[in-house]
Amino acid sequence: MELQEVLRMNGGEGDTSYAKNSAYNQLVLAKVKPVLEQCVRELLRANLPNINKCIKVADLGCASGPNTLLTVRDIVQSIDKVGQEKKNELERPTIQIFLNDLFPNDFNSVFKLLPSFYRKLEKENGRKIGSCLIGAMPGSFYSRLFPEESMHFLHSCYCLQWLSQVPSGLVTELGISTNKGSIYSSKASRLPVQKAYLDQFTKDFTTFLRIHSEELFSHGRMLLTCICKGVELDARNAIDLLEMAINDLVVEGHLEEEKLDSFNLPVYIPSAEEVKCIVEEEGSFEILYLETFKVLYDAGFSIDDEHIKAEYVASSVRAVYEPILASHFGEAIIPDIFHRFAKHAAKVLPLGKGFYNNLIISLAKKPEKSDV
């Protein structure tokens, strides 16, 4: 099965769907919103081509479920709020928003929500139906999506940790795994494995910046939020807990060791310094803002029961990783993986060691020399 076919969230609206298990991401989006407003404010000051008539925006790696339109709402509200602050504003610009993700993404679940979303925009923002136009642009964000110099603003949240492919060199010529017992570039991975993952991330992120800089107008903006490495040596991110759960099944005899050793996630969690260095090395963008912050896995969860919290965290992670796990290990073992995941989560949550480190970076496309 092709990798792109399983790089998606759980679709639909069932108990294990991303739509039902993505409340955590709403907390991240709330943290990003003030930075988004400032980014839009700077964008509207830049006087880009046609921006007073139609602002063209894309959400790269939009996923599905209510969070997709929550992101859209935040973008629209930010544009309208900043627009109201401008003097002599005569008319709101039309906003054209493209939702991007891989072809298997459950776009239909998003489209079903659009009629009520448009009505809500009209009621709460006074935006007439037709003044905000939302469509899909499926495809990999590591490839060209839009014409040259056609976009004003690109947004992406929690997507850049996904690589375009599993790094090469993780299996020797004799077919032996160089990342035994691990499923990504973890703290336990050998240095050659860590280098292979960093090299793949560097290649992919450089491609991402180059391609999308070509799609943006000069002075266009890009706002990226991603998971990043922290400095805490004993903290456990969700993939660490997932790795521990799968290893449990091997030790218990429910899963062959070879099955674990032949599995590597196409995921890399960069440090803030790595992201900064790649942006500077690629050269198309100026860094306007960079911040890191933590969000606990169970933040915003009101029930004070560690086991219920752990099940909640397990469901959130399952909604993200089930498709790719099921394609390799089979669907039957998925409940067992996340049952053990919840047990590990229940141990780290009371200690405050279960959280994501996050990075927000705001970028502006540098002008061409002829524009200066």
Swiss-Prot record:
Coiled coil: none
Record site: Involved in substrate discrimination: H155, V267, E331
pH dependence: Optimum pH is 7.0.
Nucleus recorded as keyword: no
Pathway field: Alkaloid biosynthesis
SUPFAM superfamilies the record matches: S-adenosyl-L-methionine-dependent methyltransferases
Any one Gene Ontology BP term: alkaloid metabolic process
Industrial and biotechnological uses noted in the record: Saccharomyces cerevisiae (Yeast) expressing Coffea arabica (coffee) xanthosine methyltransferase (CaXMT1) and Camellia sinensis (tea) caffeine synthase (TCS1) accumulates caffeine. Tobacco plants (Nicotiana tabacum cv. Xanthi) expressing CaXMT1, CaMXMT1 and CaDXMT1 accumulate caffeine and become less appetant and toxic for caterpillars cutworms (Spodoptera litura). Caffeine also stimulates endogenous defense mechanisms against other pathogens (e.g. tobacco mosaic virus and Pseudomonas syringae) by triggering the expression of defense-related genes.
Family: Belongs to the methyltransferase superfamily. Type-7 methyltransferase family.
Entry protein name: 7-methylxanthosine synthase 1
Native source species: Coffea arabica (Arabian coffee)
